[in-house]
Amino acid sequence: MVRIRLARGGCKKSPFYYIVVTDSRNSRDGRFIERIGFFNPVELDIKKRLRVNLDRVRYWLSNGAQPSDRVFVLIKWSKNVY
């Protein structure tokens, strides 16, 4: 099953997350099919905090990809920001 989920990046105590499309059997930070955005929870500016390619999200959702709970909330939030 293909999932849209967060992959952690950044340094210790300074998280940075990539929004990736991956097979559900792969590890959290492992192999991915496509990187479709990022989320920086430390950033204060809303425009720099989250960036999502909504066209690619729609494409993957139409092909049956399942978003994680957190990614689902971020996608809804990004539609309101942009």
Swiss-Prot record:
One of its GO terms (biological process) is translation. One of its GO terms (molecular function) is structural constituent of ribosome. One of its GO terms (cellular component) is cytoplasm. It holds the Pfam family Ribosomal_S16. Keywords: Ribonucleoprotein, Ribosomal protein. InterPro entries: Ribosomal_bS16, Ribosomal_bS16_dom_sf. Transmembrane segments: none annotated. HAMAP family: Ribosomal_bS16. PANTHER family: 30S RIBOSOMAL PROTEIN S16, SMALL RIBOSOMAL SUBUNIT PROTEIN BS16M. Belongs to the bacterial ribosomal protein bS16 family. This is Small ribosomal subunit protein bS16. The gene is rpsP.
